[in-house]
Amino acid sequence: MPNYKLLYFNMRGRAEIIRYIFAYLDIKYEDHRIEQADWPKIKPTLPFGKIPVLEVEGLTIHQSLAIARYLTKNTDLAGKTALEQCQADAVVDTLDDFMSLFPWAEKDQDLKERMFNELLTHQAPRLLKDLDTYLGDKEWFIGNYVTWADFYWDICSTTLLVLKPGLLDIYPKLVSLRNKVQAIPAISAWILKRPQTKL
């Protein structure tokens, strides 16, 4: 088993999908969390100057979803068939497209608040309706077993509920899916022991 070192801020953010996968697959890794104050001196040392990165076998891999796909490859978490893997990837990419619209780094607080409000009030309901329809009466997004798409839904929706607590009130099936993910023993244990951060 390779030695893994995950580098990210002390928050859930874009690294949490990687942490969920490590937890579920029972893979040991170093969860190295950096403080915002240290970021300016660390940034120039990284390929592409972004985190999270995963250090493995002398390589530094960037891009959270690429790392997640690497870790889930050849496991059922990715999907059991090529078609199911494509479906899981599509759900993840749909969620990621939306989460990437938020201006997390915007310095103008008034503008940031307006943009967040627009996304949460007008665009989020459309996304949730589509996800609810896609889930339908299935137990998980891709049928009868959990994939990393379900993990990513739980992670993204947790952040959305921090930003707008009542957002899922009319989507009981999506709430139920969150609950099922959080009830998986390995995920439940991780949620209990992880550092408590807002995002």
Swiss-Prot record:
Boundaries of every GST C-terminal domain copy: 81-199
Cofactor(s) listed in the protein's UniProt record: glutathione
Biological-process GO terms, alphabetical: negative regulation of male germ cell proliferation; prostaglandin biosynthetic process; prostaglandin metabolic process; response to nematode; response to selenium ion
Binding site for glutathione: 8, 14, 39, 49-51, 63-64
Keywords: Cytoplasm, Fatty acid biosynthesis, Fatty acid metabolism, Isomerase, Lipid biosynthesis, Lipid metabolism, Prostaglandin biosynthesis, Prostaglandin metabolism, Transferase
GO cellular component terms, semicolon-separated: cytosol; nucleoplasm
Entry's Gene Ontology molecular function annotations: calcium ion binding; glutathione transferase activity; magnesium ion binding; prostaglandin-D synthase activity; protein homodimerization activity
Cell compartment(s), UniProt: Cytoplasm
CDD domains membership: GST_C_Sigma, GST_N_Sigma_like
InterPro entries in the cross-refs: Glutathione-S-Trfase_C-like, Glutathione-S-Trfase_C_sf, Glutathione_S-Trfase, Glutathione_S-Trfase_N, GST_C, GST_superfamily, Thioredoxin-like_sf
PROSITE patterns (alphabetical): GST_CTER, GST_NTER
Segments traversing the membrane: none
GST N-terminal domain mapped to chain residues: 2-79
Cofactor binding annotation: Glutathione is required for the prostaglandin D synthase activity.
This enzyme's EC code(s): 5.3.99.2, 2.5.1.18
Tissues expressing the protein: Expressed in skin and oviduct.
Catalysed reactions, as listed in the record: prostaglandin H2 = prostaglandin D2; RX + glutathione = an S-substituted glutathione + a halide anion + H(+); 2-glyceryl-prostaglandin H2 = 2-glyceryl-prostaglandin D2
Subunit relationships: Homodimer.
Family stated for the protein in its record: Belongs to the GST superfamily. Sigma family.
Descriptive protein name: Hematopoietic prostaglandin D synthase
Native source organism of the sequence: Mus musculus
